Amino acid sequence: GYTDINEALTDIQNGTFQYPLIVKPVDSSGSKGVSQVNHFEEAEESLKCALSYSRGHRLIVEEYVEKYGYQVAGDGLSIDGKLIFRYFANDHFDSRCKNPFVPVAASFPYNMPEDVQNKIHATIQRLLTLLGMRTSTYNFDIRVDKDYNVYLMEVAPRDGGNYIPQAIRYATGV
């Protein structure tokens, strides 16, 4: 991550990352401060925007991951370090919105094959194990590419917003 815009600009200009890029604050929510950078000329404004939404004055730059199908939204629960429940949804976006990274809807159930969902589950479990996460609820934002590689965009130790926990309860009875 970065706290210094000039350091981030230097890394971007030196080719540390391949375009397009995603710039976002490390500690924001609701996709506030998230933007896509397609050319170096857009970088400084995006970096300033991300920092303006960061409580800790820190941002990250990452390469954009092209999703296959829908972005995965979901919630989960771990007890004693084991992910015992998770439910995934299809995130829907509208490029006409002011911030196209904010989901406008979610549909259940997630429409990828069970083996892909199991791969997502295993990837989340690996992260929880590596971080020593024990007992918590989680909110997930995940992308799967055309080769079924799993990219954890965000795993936050909290319930999802936008009534996702209630929708999951109606969909699963849990």
Residue ranges, per PLM feature:
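Single, functionally critical "micro-switch" positions that shape active/binding sites
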Residues: 23, 153, 172
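Short glycine/serine/threonine-biased micro-segments
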Residues: 28-31, 158-159, 171
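A short secondary-structure junction signal
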Residues: 33-35, 164-167
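Active-site nucleotide/adenylate-binding loops and adjacent lid/helix of ATP-dependent enzymes
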Residues: 1-60, 109-122, 126
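Phosphate-binding core of ATP-grasp and ATP-grasp-like enzymes
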Residues: 50-58, 65-110, 118-152, 156-164
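Short polybasic/polar patches that bind polyanions
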Residues: 13, 129, 170
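Gly/Ser/Thr-rich active-site loops/lids in small-molecule metabolic enzymes
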Residues: 168-174
